[in-house]
Every structure is written in structure tokens, then in C-alpha cells.
């Protein structure tokens, strides 16, 4: 029996890529998984994929830059699993769209909001 059995992990940006890989690995160790992601279609696919693997998963559509979305995710996670044991702040964006020289203040603000404020929200 794993030390992670029946523990609950929240993973932001969990619907694909590194986040989904982390969710899969943790779920295979017996953890309950809560995926938070802005992309609801990809989130539904990830939920179905993890469920097929026998992982107990809850997907919550959210924007990491919105504090109320974090609160909703936490409320739903606790309602479903009773407690949150681990948080993986995985959501992030590589850069603003387009060339750096053409990046305006609004685009840089978006990068900072997701990559920095999303972690401390």
C-alpha cells in the first residue's frame, strides 16, 4: 500500500502535458486527483482518460488568475474527497503570443498573471 493511498492532490493546468502526466503518476500511486484547467474540453478528455485507468478524479474548469475559481475548486475538492493533501501549481504559459519586440503591456500582464499570480492566488 502506497503512502499516497486515499490522499488528494490538486493539480492546476492538469488537463494535458506535464500536469496530466503528474496526475497519472500520482493517481497510479492511489491518490485522488483534482484537475484544475481553463480548457473545459481538454479537461473532460483528461478526466475520462484517468477514469479509464481506475483513478478517482474530479475535473474543475478554472482560471488560475481568478481567486474565486480557486475557492470553488477547493470547495468542490473537499466536498468530494474530504481534504486536500497536496497542491501542484503546474499551470503556466511560456510567453505572450507573437515576437517579444511586438509584445504589448497587456500581453506581458497576462503572462505574469498566469505564471506568478496564479501560484499565489
Regions found by a protein language model. Give the residues of each.
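Canonical Rossmann dinucleotide-binding motif of NAD(H)/NADP(H)-dependent dehydrogenases/reductases
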Residues: 2-34
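A glycine-rich helix->loop->beta "capping" turn
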Residues: 5, 53-56, 76-87, 107
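Conserved glycine-rich Rossmann-like NAD(P)H-binding loop of the short-chain dehydrogenase/reductase
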Residues: 29-45
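The beta1-alpha1 cofactor-binding region of Rossmann-like NAD(H)/NADP(H)-dependent oxidoreductases
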Residues: 40-41, 61-72, 105
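A structural preference for long, well-packed, hydrophobic secondary-structure segments
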Residues: 12-21, 42, 47, 59-64
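Conserved NAD(P)H cofactor-binding loop of Rossmann-fold oxidoreductase domains
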Residues: 91-96
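Substrate-binding pocket helix/loop in short-chain dehydrogenase/reductase
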Residues: 98-100, 107-110
